[in-house]
A protein has these predicted regions:
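Walker A/P-loop phosphate-binding element recognition
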Residues: 3-129, 136-138
Length: 138
């Protein structure tokens, strides 16, 4: 069930459905596509001002590249994850991976990912990696 724009994505994509048409940004999509095609690319970070469309750009690019990742494309929304300790379970949830009590969660996640070729979007990861502000928010 794919359409080039205004698509409703199938479950195999593991991406949120986009109900609006994606317009423009072909240069950015081409650059991201090129970088992800590099065999040495294990991590790609999109940076920009909040609200500039990084998430939508990542989702559109992932949807277009889906067939190049035989084990799928996944989206892990991390804005609601309150602490770094909960990062691994949040990623596992996005991957539909059930963590058991046998090994450490991080080990289970790494073992799961090790032999797979997939694209994983970690949205809002930076909020879990940055130190807390020195002053309280008002």
């Amino acid at each position: 069930m794919r359409k080039q724009s205004n698509r409703l994505l199938s479950q195999e994509d593991h991406l949120p459905r986009q109900l609006t048409t994606f317009v423009g940004r072909s240069q950015e999509i081409a650059e991201i596509t090129s970088l992800l095609a590099e065999p040495t690319c294990r991590l790609l970070t999109l940076v920009g001002m909040g609200g500039s469309g990084k998430t939508r750009l990542a989702l559109e690019t992932a949807a277009r590249l889906g067939p190049q990742f035989p084990d799928g494309v996944y989206f892990a929304p991390l804005q609601a994850v309150p602490s770094p300790e909960l990062l691994t379970p949040a990623i596992a949830d996005a991957l539909d991976l059930t963590l058991t009590g046998h090994d450490e969660p991080q080990i289970q996640l790494l073992n799961y990912l090790r032999d797979r070729t997939l694209l994983l979007i970690l949205d809002n990861l930076e909020q879990l990696l940055l130190p807390p502000p020195l002053y309280p928010k008002r």
